[in-house]
């Protein structure tokens, strides 16, 4: 079978991968040994199914690989799905992993007297400009977003932006940087995502794997 004919599953690097792999294995997909080798520089891996490969990419890129058909299935947080809003993606299953929230945070001294309900214009550092703008536009608040890909917590102390929008889990990073969570935009978990075209061209195969992941989640 040529590489172009294989079913490709896109998985995110990092913490979510650790939570996703028990579900992937429970669904019956076992990657080759190099997948678990921290020294391996491979990004594409074979599995116990000769017609299935796994690729390991940045979390924000999983949705793009699936939307454009380079991968057929993937695991992505609904934060990423909301930001890109790809019509080519179908998300049939909440995997219940990677739980966190997308929140607004600001310096502790400002949060002590601030009221988010009174905001009319905000300048925000975030990796999620589209989600942020939509959220505040729905409240009639103008949001000026400065796009950053990391180290969001530095923005207020360096005068770049007064507030940030970022993923929050325990809140420990915010606290360590003198910031306080003041508003939640969305609760976030990771979803199984599917390319809609693949659903039409490989319906039985795709439906079978969706069901396998559903059972792996206890459904």
Swiss-Prot record:
E.C. number(s) listed in UniProt: 2.4.2.17
Which Gene3D superfamilies does the record associate with it? Periplasmic binding protein-like II
One annotated Gene Ontology cellular component of this protein? cytoplasm
Q: Tell me the keywords, alphabetical order.
A: Amino-acid biosynthesis, ATP-binding, Cytoplasm, Glycosyltransferase, Histidine biosynthesis, Nucleotide-binding, Transferase
Q: Which residues form a coiled coil?
A: none
Q: In which pathway does it act?
A: Amino-acid biosynthesis; L-histidine biosynthesis; L-histidine from 5-phospho-alpha-D-ribose 1-diphosphate: step 1/9
Q: Can you tell which superkingdom this protein's organism belongs to?
A: Bacteria
Q: Which CDD domains match?
A: PBP2_HisGs (cd13595)
Q: Which reaction does it catalyse?
A: 1-(5-phospho-beta-D-ribosyl)-ATP + diphosphate = 5-phospho-alpha-D-ribose 1-diphosphate + ATP
Tell me, how does this one assemble?
Heteromultimer composed of HisG and HisZ subunits.
| Record comment regarding domains | Lacks the C-terminal regulatory region which is replaced by HisZ.
Give the protein family: Belongs to the ATP phosphoribosyltransferase family. Short subfamily.
Q: What is this protein called?
A: ATP phosphoribosyltransferase
Lineage, uppermost ranks: Bacteria, Pseudomonadati, Pseudomonadota, Alphaproteobacteria, Rhodospirillales
């Amino acid at each position: 079978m040529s590489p172009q004919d294989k079913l490709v599953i896109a998985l995110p690097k990092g913490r979510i991968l650790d939570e996703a792999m028990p579900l992937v294995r429970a669904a019956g997909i076992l990657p080759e040994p190099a997948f678990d080798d921290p020294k391996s520089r491979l990004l594409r891996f074979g599995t116990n199914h000769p017609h299935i490969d796994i690729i390991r990419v940045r979390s924000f890129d999983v949705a793009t690989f699936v939307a454009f058909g380079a991968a057929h299935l993937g695991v992505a947080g609904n934060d990423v799905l909301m930001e890109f809003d790809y019509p080519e993606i179908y998300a049939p299953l909440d995997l219940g992993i990677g739980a966190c929230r997308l929140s607004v945070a600001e310096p502790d001294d400002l949060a002590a007297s601030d009221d988010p309900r009174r905001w009319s214009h905000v300048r925000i550092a975030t990796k999620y400009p589209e989600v942020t703008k939509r959220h505040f536009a729905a409240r009639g608040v103008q949001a000026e977003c400065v796009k950053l890909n990391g180290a969001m917590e530095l923005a207020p102390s360096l005068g770049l932006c007064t507030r940030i929008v970022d993923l929050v889990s325990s809140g420990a990073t915010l606290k360590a940087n003198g910031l306080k969570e003041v508003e939640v935009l969305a609760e976030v978990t990771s979803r199984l995502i599917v390319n809609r075209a693949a659903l039409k061209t490989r319906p039985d195969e795709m439906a079978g794997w969706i069901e396998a992941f559903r059972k792996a989640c206890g459904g």
